Design a protein with these regions (language model features):
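Alpha-carbonic anhydrase
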Residues: 2-5, 20-289
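Bacterial N-terminal signal peptides
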Residues: 8-16
Length: 289
C-alpha cells in the first residue's frame, strides 16, 4: 500500500457535502457488479425497470424528461460536468489517497441490454479497502470508469478521454476524482485493463491473476480543481464533491483507438456553473470568460 498526499497550508476550504438522492441508482455503467468466478466472464443485467437513457435519441438534452427520478438532469442548478475556467486560487483541504493493487474486474456495461448502440462505459470495480481522505472526510473507492471524449473542459478545451474514480462515505456522500487524458506516450498503467476490455456489452471479466493499482492511474501532481456538482449521468443527483486533477496524464493514439473501439461517445455536455465556487491549487487568479 502506498500513501500519497497533498498537504494544505493554513487556509483550508472544506466542502459541505450534501447526501445524494439514490447514489445507488447512478447509471448502470457506474454500479459495482457482483463478482464473476475467477478467470471467467458473465453477463451483467441492467437494474429491473430502469428507465432507458443514452447519448443519442434519449440523450442528455432529454434526460430530465425521461423519468421523475431524472428531474435534476433538467432542473438542477449544481450540475456536472463544467468548464473549469475562472478558478480562484486556494489552499485546499488535504487530499490523501490510500490505494493498493487489486484483482482486475472489468465491466463493459450497456444501460439497457435490449437496446443496441446506446450509451455505455467501461468500468473497473474496486475490490475494497482503497480510500481517499479529503480534509477529515474518508471515502471508499467503489469503481472507476471512462468517458470519451472528456466531460470536463479546461478553459474551453476538451480532452480525448476522462476517468472518474467514484468514492462513497459511510453516510452515502459521494466524491469523484476526475483524471483527464491527453494523447501522448503510452500509459503502462492502462495496459492490464485495455488488454482485457470485454468485446461484448453487458459482460464482466474477472481476472485474479492481474492486478491494477488505481494510484498508478493518477498524475504525480495532486493539484486539483474542486467544486460541488452532480453525477454526470441520470439521475444527475447533486451533492457530489468533484476533485479534478489539474495535470492530465497520457495515453497513446493506439490506446485511445482501443478504448473507442468498445466505447461509443459517452460524454455529457458541460453545464452552467451558476455562481458555484470553483477553486484550484497552484494557479494565478484568472478572469472567467
Amino acid at each position: 500500500m502506498r500513501l500519497r498526499h497533498l498537504l494544505a497550508p493554513a487556509l483550508a476550504l472544506p466542502f459541505a457535502l450534501v447526501a445524494c438522492s439514490k447514489p445507488e441508482a447512478d447509471a448502470p455503467a457506474q454500479q459495482p457488479a457482483a463478482a464473476a468466478p475467477a478467470g471467467a466472464t458473465r453477463p451483467v443485467a441492467p437494474p429491473a425497470g430502469a428507465p432507458h437513457w443514452d447519448y443519442e435519441t434519449d440523450g442528455p438534452a432529454t434526460w430530465g424528461t425521461l423519468s421523475p427520478d431524472f428531474a435534476a438532469c433538467g432542473a438542477g442548478k449544481r450540475q456536472s460536468p463544467v468548464d473549469l475556467v475562472g478558478a480562484k486560487p486556494a489552499r485546499l483541504a488535504q487530499l490523501l489517497t490510500s490505494f493498493r493493487p487489486a484483482e482486475l474486474r472489468v465491466v463493459h456495461h450497456e444501460h439497457m441490454a435490449d437496446v443496441v448502440n446506446t450509451g455505455h462505459s467501461v468500468q473497473v470495480n474496486a475490490a475494497g479497502g482503497d480510500t481517499i481522505t479529503v480534509g477529515e472526510e474518508r471515502f471508499v473507492l467503489l469503481q472507476y470508469h471512462f468517458h470519451s471524449p472528456s466531460e470536463h473542459h479546461v478553459e474551453g478545451r476538451a480532452f480525448p478521454a476522462e476517468m472518474h474514480l467514484v468514492h462513497k462515505a459511510a453516510d452515502g456522500r459521494l466524491a469523484v476524482i476526475g483524471v483527464l487524458f491527453e494523447e501522448g506516450a503510452a500509459n503502462p498503467a492502462l495496459e492490464p485493463i485495455w488488454a482485457n476490455l470485454p468485446a461484448s456489452k453487458g459482460v464482466e471479466s474477472h481476472l485474479p491473476h492481474l492486478t491494477v493499482d488505481a494510484d498508478d492511474l493518477l498524475p504525480v501532481s495532486r493539484a486539483s480543481y474542486r467544486y460541488e456538482g452532480s453525477l454526470t449521468t441520470p439521475p444527475c443527483s447533486e451533492g457530489v464533491t468533484w476533485i479534478v486533477m489539474r495535470a492530465p496524464v497520457t495515453m497513446s493514439s493506439e490506446q485511445l483507438a482501443r478504448l473507442r473501439g468498445v466505447l461509443a461517445a459517452n460524454n455529457r455536455p458541460v453545464q452552467p456553473l451558476n455562481g458555484r465556487p470553483l477553486v484550484a491549487e497552484g494557479i494565478e487568479e484568472t478572469v472567467a470568460r
